[in-house]
């Protein structure tokens, strides 16, 4: 009988690193023999007051092509009714575990509700894959939502010792068991922290016919190119990179910043 695993987080129709990560995780798990993978996704990830469009309308790639991953878009941040629908779907699938992607403190509200129902009505393992613990903006509201959202979990995945230490700081009275091989603690009062290196994505492949020099000529780029890729947010440090690059251009004329 196949092991069932649910990857909860933004599906492949969304843009952004977390959507890519969750999709890549589902794809890799699907490649394992005897594993049946379900990807349950948001339809809307953030409060309605957030104006940004997160749907990827440009990419024509199907990152899950050729897999058996079953994708369902169901969870709407702004419609609590869908939180209950999400729980019922998870209960119906009855997986061995649900891996929740944790990357925004405000999602602690719906995720807490969903995880709490799973904990109360099933024996499914609840795993939170932590892309951070301490919010970058670090407001008191974010801290409360983070603590509320994460406390239901049975196990946690972290990608740095710093993240594990932050988790211990917000739950100072909770005993933890830290492992790097996925072993779960046998102690009832402990929760497991699984430390894994951040993986290299397998959903992207280089274009063998990509002409690097032609691209540089078209975009007036110099020999050496420094690339910033991703959303522009203060904590990502783009302003520091620009300042550092400005100093570099005082000494060299063969560099570009893209």
Regions found by a protein language model. Give the residues of each.
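Nucleotide-activated donor-dependent transferases that construct or modify glycoconjugates
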Residues: 2-15, 98, 102
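A short helix/loop element that forms part of the nucleotide-sugar donor recognition site in Leloir-type
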Residues: 190-192, 205-220, 225
